[in-house]
Design a protein with these regions (language model features):
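Chalcogenol-based redox active-site neighborhoods
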Residues: 1-152
Length: 152
């Protein structure tokens, strides 16, 4: 992971589904200013992501926001339709905004890409959590392995 505390986030293009259509925006336009959490994971519908990571954030979203976090974002390298559908299945509406990095622009800019070709998954994102305030990294946690979900 190249990203460090006090770094500005790379302002890459990210996708989200808006009114049923993919919308491309700069990350700064999506997360804005204020204090937010952005967590990244290898892929929608994958085992650890679906059984632990996303459900953990859904279950604890109110507690996280009670600590001064204004918004929570989930980012993966899947397309925006998949991220939206996965979010709907996991009841993220009003709790977590689902973001898509299909070209790995953000993922590569922060050094979070991992090769999962041997498992038929291609290049994916490592599992991480970033606390951001006014587009600056305040805290960051990165898992050593994508199957782990203890720090993030």
């Amino acid at each position: 992971m190249k990203l460090k505390i006090k770094d500005q986030l790379p302002d890459t293009e990210i996708f989200q589904l808006v009114d049923g259509e993919p919308q491309k925006s700069k990350l700064s336009e999506i997360i804005g200013n204020g204090k937010v959490v952005l967590f990244g994971l290898p892929g929608a519908f994958t085992s650890t992501c679906s059984k632990l990571h996303l459900p953990g954030f859904v279950a604890n979203a109110d507690k996280i926001k009670a600590k001064g976090i204004e918004q929570i974002f989930c980012l993966s390298v899947n397309d925006p339709y998949v991220m939206n559908g996965w979010g709907e299945i996991n009841n993220t509406t009003g709790k977590i905004k689902m973001l898509s990095d299909p070209y790995l622009l953000f993922t590569k800019a922060i050094g979070a890409e991992v090769d999962r070709n041997a498992k038929g998954m291609g290049i994916r994102s490592n599992r991480y959590l970033i606390v951001i305030e006014n587009f600056t990294v305040v805290n960051i946690h990165v898992e050593k392995e994508t199957k782990e979900c203890g720090l993030t």
